[in-house]
């Protein structure tokens, strides 16, 4: 199991294609994950993106877009290990805090997209 393991999901009332258009912008990746070096491993279009991760972490990350009813569930996964940390030093790290910070980064991404795509939409109304 990875030391950093995040699995999260958020519903966005918008079509997967619209969500994918927001997720696929590399400039946004630097805002959402400024310290990570992301290399696209697989661009899945309206199904999301898979990356390899380098920098302070080494591993994989994915945003999977699942069509659900009148919107999209944005699944965010990160599986990684701290870089340049010995097994002995790993035990002294605040892994819970590191996982929490990475989960918050994922929520920042999904809520930014949600806010943009659901702007002006009344609760219970269909997506635009």
State what each model feature region is.
Residues 38-42, 94-95:
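Juxtamembrane/interface motifs at transmembrane-helix termini
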Residues 19-23, 29, 49-51, 74-76, ...:
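Hydrophobic pocket/interface hotspot
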Residues 1-39, 128:
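Hydrophobic ligand-binding cavity/cleft-lining segments
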Residues 1, 52-54:
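Residues embedded in well-ordered secondary-structure elements
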Residues 9-13, 52, 64:
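Generic structural detector for well-ordered beta-strands
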Residues 54-128:
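Beta-strand/loop substructures that line and gate deep hydrophobic ligand-binding cavities in soluble
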Residues 34-38, 45-49, 57-61:
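A generic structural signal for short beta-strands and their flanking turns/coil linkers
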Residues 3, 46-48, 69-73:
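A generic structural signal for beta-strand entry/edge sites
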